[in-house]
């Protein structure tokens, strides 16, 4: 997390993507900045300051998930979204609540790995190009009994690398000169479409037993990988594609994964964000039959994770003491007070998000960075078509979205995507074959395409 991003700056960045909901934006910005404040305190006091977890209540499609997702991107924090209804009480078949922490660690590992790949890419590319040169211009193989026995022992121990075979070769002056020539051509990009055959490590098969062990924090693939020799397969690829594969291989050799995993765990513990959606669906306010899994039991399983506990993962133990939890739900048939009291107390910040108005829809269509209209304009630009929306057309689209939400299920801003897809289906279908340089979407066109559907309520429910 960076010093520069104050709560006000975080809100300004969120404003680029999310319309309205200022109270929610302020709350998440303050909760996030409090992490930075905590890290400035003495170590002893840091342990006593817990994150101010948040409970968002509001109808679907008003920006609950988007606020949390954008927040994580802004501060480059590990982020996972889970649905409370997917978890089952301990003792039942299904996902256990600790899996959300394991998913978060996996995301942190992926982020750390990407950063390390970027750091070593130059060095890995150089090594990959050297390997390509040797593949294009192979040396003269020299086999002897001692080397064969040594390779067999390495294969049995799982340490044999097929690329080691290149070391057991004789390089004459002619081969050396040809390799210099090929290296020069590679650097100039003259051999990108030439095909080469490379040996790559075979992806391990998915093992259901291994997945179960992973849920218990045991990495079976790593344990078995140390005992069994690594299998390789031959693939014929273009030089440009082969280089990418080899860069990945060489990058992994240059990275200290033990150190990477430790950083990923620390990143998870200090910066991780877990978004628990549909938490209202596991409250006592939702009717349940005697045959259903106890939803209150799921709440009690979630409680120690949110409260602060240690979860075993295949990368090591992870403390959840300072992970930020954001829970969200529509609470249409229940209320936050229907949660068990202990869990309520772990979400001290309560934010209510407002239903979107017609004016909000107009802003959502136009204002955000990469808004829906900007996305469709960019898509059709690929066909050489300039797509233009008049202000009257935008107002009419917003009005239709608002009215359909009022008359049927209110799905918030998601209604706009459905309406635009129906409105532009002919243009998107015929676009590649049209020679028109510009298409203007007017209010009249919007009414022509959508009026019949809006009048017929049954069609509205089915299509929009």
Swiss-Prot record:
> Does Cytoplasm count among this protein's keywords?
yes
Q: Which Gene3D superfamilies match?
A: 1.10.8.60, DNA helicase RuvA subunit, C-terminal domain, P-loop containing nucleotide triphosphate hydrolases
In the record, what terms sit under GO molecular function?
ATP binding; ATP hydrolysis activity; peptidase activity; proteasome-activating activity
What CDD domains does the database record attribute to this sequence? RecA-like_HslU (cd19498)
Main localisation, per the record?
cytoplasm
Q: Cellular location of this protein?
A: Cytoplasm
Which cellular components does GO assign to this protein? HslUV protease complex
Write out the transmembrane intervals. Answer: none
Q: What Gene Ontology terms for biological process does this UniProt record contain? A: protein unfolding; proteolysis involved in protein catabolic process
Signal peptide residues on this chain, from the entry's feature table: none
- Positions binding ATP in this chain are 19, 61-66, 277, 342, 414
InterPro entries for the chain = AAA+_ATPase, ATP-dep_Clp_protease_ClpX, ATPase_AAA_core, Clp_ATPase_C, HslU, P-loop_NTPase
Keyword annotations from UniProtKB, A to Z: ATP-binding, Chaperone, Cytoplasm, Nucleotide-binding
Give the protein's biological function. Answer: ATPase subunit of a proteasome-like degradation complex; this subunit has chaperone activity. The binding of ATP and its subsequent hydrolysis by HslU are essential for unfolding of protein substrates subsequently hydrolyzed by HslV. HslU recognizes the N-terminal part of its protein substrates and unfolds these before they are guided to HslV for hydrolysis.
- Cite the NCBIfam families for this sequence: hslU, PRK05201.1
Q: Which family does it belong to?
A: Belongs to the ClpX chaperone family. HslU subfamily.
The record, for PANTHER family, names:
ATP-DEPENDENT CLP PROTEASE ATP-BINDING SUBUNIT CLPX-LIKE, MITOCHONDRIAL-RELATED, ATP-DEPENDENT PROTEASE ATPASE SUBUNIT HSLU
Subunit text: A double ring-shaped homohexamer of HslV is capped on each side by a ring-shaped HslU homohexamer. The assembly of the HslU/HslV complex is dependent on binding of ATP.
The name of this protein is ATP-dependent protease ATPase subunit HslU
Instruction: Tell me which species this is from.
Output: Lactobacillus gasseri (strain ATCC 33323 / DSM 20243 / BCRC 14619 / CIP 102991 / JCM 1131 / KCTC 3163 / NCIMB 11718 / NCTC 13722 / AM63)
Tell me the organism's taxonomic lineage: Bacteria, Bacillati, Bacillota, Bacilli, Lactobacillales
State the gene name recorded for this protein: hslU
């Amino acid at each position: 997390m960076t010093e520069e991003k104050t709560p006000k700056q975080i809100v300004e960045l969120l404003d680029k993507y999310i319309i309205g909901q200022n109270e929610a934006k302020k709350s998440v910005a303050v909760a996030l900045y409090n992490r930075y404040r905590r890290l400035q305190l003495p170590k002893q006091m840091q342990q006593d300051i817990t994150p101010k977890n948040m409970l968002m209540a509001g109808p679907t499609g008003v920006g609950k998930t988007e606020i949390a997702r954008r927040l994580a991107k802004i501060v480059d924090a590990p982020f996972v979204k889970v649905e409370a209804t997917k978890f089952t009480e301990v003792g039942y078949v299904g996902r256990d609540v600790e899996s959300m922490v394991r998913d978060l660690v996996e995301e942190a590992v992926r982020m750390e790995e990407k950063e390390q790949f970027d750091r070593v890419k130059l060095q890995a590319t150089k090594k990959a190009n050297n390997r390509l040169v040797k593949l294009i211009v192979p040396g003269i193989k020299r086999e002897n009994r001692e080397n064969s026995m040594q390779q067999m022992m390495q294969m049995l121990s799982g340490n044999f690398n097929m690329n080691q075979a290149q070391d057991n070769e004789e390089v004459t002056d002619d081969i050396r000169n040809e390799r210099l020539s090929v290296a020069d051509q590679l650097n100039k990009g003259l051999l990108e479409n030439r095909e080469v055959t490379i040996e790559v490590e075979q992806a391990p098969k998915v093992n259901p037993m291994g997945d179960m062990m992973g849920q218990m924090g045991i990495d079976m693939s790593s344990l078995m990988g140390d005992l069994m020799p690594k299998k390789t397969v031959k693939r014929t690829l273009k030089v440009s594609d082969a280089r990418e594969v080899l860069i990945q291989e060489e990058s992994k050799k240059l990275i200290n994964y033990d150190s990477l995993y430790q950083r990923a765990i620390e990143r998870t513990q200090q910066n991780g964000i877990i978004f628990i959606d549909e938490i209202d669906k596991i409250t006592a306010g939702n009717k349940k039959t005697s045959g259903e899994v106890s939803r209150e039991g799921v709440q009690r399983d979630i409680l120690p994770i949110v409260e602060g506990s240690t979860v075993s993962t295949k990368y090591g133990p992870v403390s959840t003491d300072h992970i930020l939890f954001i829970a969200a739900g529509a609470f249409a048939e229940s209320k936050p007070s229907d949660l068990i009291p202990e869990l309520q107390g772990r979400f001290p910040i309560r934010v209510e998000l407002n239903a979107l108005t017609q004016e909000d829809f107009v802003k959502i269509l136009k204002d955000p960075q990469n808004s829906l209209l900007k996305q469709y304009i960019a898509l059709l630009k690929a066909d050489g078509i300039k797509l233009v929306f008049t202000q009257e057309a935008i107002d009419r689209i917003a009005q239709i979205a608002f009215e359909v939400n009022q008359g049927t299920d209110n799905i918030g801003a998601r209604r706009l995507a459905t309406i635009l897809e129906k409105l532009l289906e002919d243009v998107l279908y015929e676009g590649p074959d049209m020679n028109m340089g510009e298409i203007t979407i007017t209010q009249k066109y919007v009414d022509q395409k959508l009026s019949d559907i809006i009048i017929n309520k049954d069609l509205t429910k089915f299509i929009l």
